Amino acid sequence: TMGIALKYLGYSMNTDDIAALEAAKDLLISQKTQGIVKAYQVDETKDKMIAGEAAMGVMWSGDAQYAITQNPDLAYVIPKEGSNVWVDCMVIPKAAKNKTNAEKFIDFLCRPDIAKLNCEAIGYSSPNAGAIELMGADYQDNPVMNPTDEDVANCDTIHYLSDTLLLIYNALWADVKNAK
């Protein structure tokens, strides 16, 4: 939420500029006190959107894809100011006892036929070229699953926050949550 406010104001989601962070906090508090925002939520947003209890929400693309399948009156957009880009990663710990089986499992998930099934089951896009080909034009032309290069160009990959910056973010967010 803080990141989206930063993008709206023209800043990177990764800024450490205190004035920019304060401006984002002030924007969020203003939205809240004016009644523009019903609630700052994460997982509950898709359910509220599906039920028609909210007019707009910030959510992960997979949640949006699911919500649209449940309520065709919904649409998904990436704000012109941008958003965030994210990925889920698979790792094998150095001390893993079954490294060979872990590698086999990752290889299995990367098979195009399995990656296709996984994508269809979870509603999130796939970087697997073979899976994308198997899913066909409906998937390839879906802007929720495959945003344009122009949309992605305006987006930030969120970087690690230093311990100091994390404390600042937490304090600013507490101000937003406690605003009446």
Show which residues each predicted segment covers:
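Periplasmic-binding protein-like
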Residues: 3, 27-31, 70-94
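Short, hydrophobic alpha-helical packing/hinge segments within bilobed ligand-binding/sensory domains
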Residues: 45-48, 64, 102, 115
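A ligand-binding cleft/hinge motif common to bilobed small-molecule-binding domains
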Residues: 56-73
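Mature extracytoplasmic/periplasmic domains
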Residues: 84, 93-153
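Sec-exported extracytoplasmic/periplasmic mature domains
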Residues: 6-11, 29-33, 50, 54, ...
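Extracytoplasmic ligand-binding site segments that recognize negatively charged/polar headgroups
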Residues: 1-53
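Generic hydrophobic alpha-helical scaffold/packing signal
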Residues: 46, 50, 68, 93, ...
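Conserved C-terminal helix/tail region of periplasmic/extracytoplasmic solute-binding proteins
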Residues: 47, 149-180
